[in-house]
Amino acid sequence: MGGHIRLHQDGHRIFHHSGIAAFAEYAVMSVHSLVKIDPTIPPEHAALLGCAVMTGAGAVINTSEVTVGDTVAVVGAGGVGLSAMMAAVAAGSTKIIAIDISDEKLEITRKFGATHAFNATDPDIVSKVKAQTDGGVHIAIESAGVPKALELAFDVTRIGGKTVAAGLPSPSRNVSISHFVLGAQERSLKGSYMGSCIPSRDIPKFLTMYQQGILRIDHLAGDQIKLEDLNEAFDLMKKGGALRTVLVP
């Protein structure tokens, strides 16, 4: 392949996301994709910074700029959403609403800082969230990657509230929100790609918070599997039965 293509199969180039994807024992990486970390940090915990923690915590700290006393809703209780909840606690939020379609996932959200939990399929969920938050949350983080989740996140914010889209759906998916409410109630809607993070700046910061016991990244670590069992991990993820599965040598 001339030595200039990093990933290939049978002579064909393999395209991948963010320049870092590599399910392999060894990989050649761009220097721009590397961040030096404290060697005392367990690699199975540091690995979680690559997406889940950086995306979720970054959406709270960088994109939405949660401050002390803000009420926060997180729609989607996967790895990104749980990371957002931990970051909301660290930022000083005293009321954190967890929303998901899975009661099983909602049960574990309190371990990550949620003070209230609601099933997204509840037809009265918007009124229930607003009743708990004096008219709606200050900030809602969508971390499910589906349009309905973003619409719900927008609906549970208060007048002047901010909705942050951290999930990534298919490029063809669209959302429907009230143009009138967006303008008349001075709400805002903002995107957050990878937590608006600069890895060289934010990964060390988040790892310091982990070492201080502020971001319990270790709570996100699920099963550890071998590389040859990778497909089983994907199957588990599709079923919604995994937090963050870690590949180990």
Outline where the language-model segments fall.
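Glycine-rich phosphate/adenylate-binding loop and adjacent beta-alpha elements
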Residues: 1-34
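Residues in the short beta-alpha loop(s) of Rossmann-like NAD(P)-binding domains
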Residues: 102, 169, 195
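Generic hydrophobic/aromatic pocket-lining and core-packing "Φ" positions
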Residues: 85, 106, 150-154, 179
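Rossmann-fold dehydrogenase core element
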Residues: 161-164, 176-219, 243
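A short acidic, Gly/Pro-enriched loop at the edge of an enzyme's catalytic core
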Residues: 124, 128-140
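C-terminal hydrophobic helical "lid"/dimerization subdomain
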Residues: 123, 147, 151-155, 200-249
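A generic alpha-to-beta junction signature in SAM-dependent methyltransferases
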Residues: 66, 133, 144, 155-158
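Mid-domain Rossmann-like dinucleotide-binding core that forms the NAD(H)/NADP(H) cofactor-binding site
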Residues: 32-33, 38-123, 127
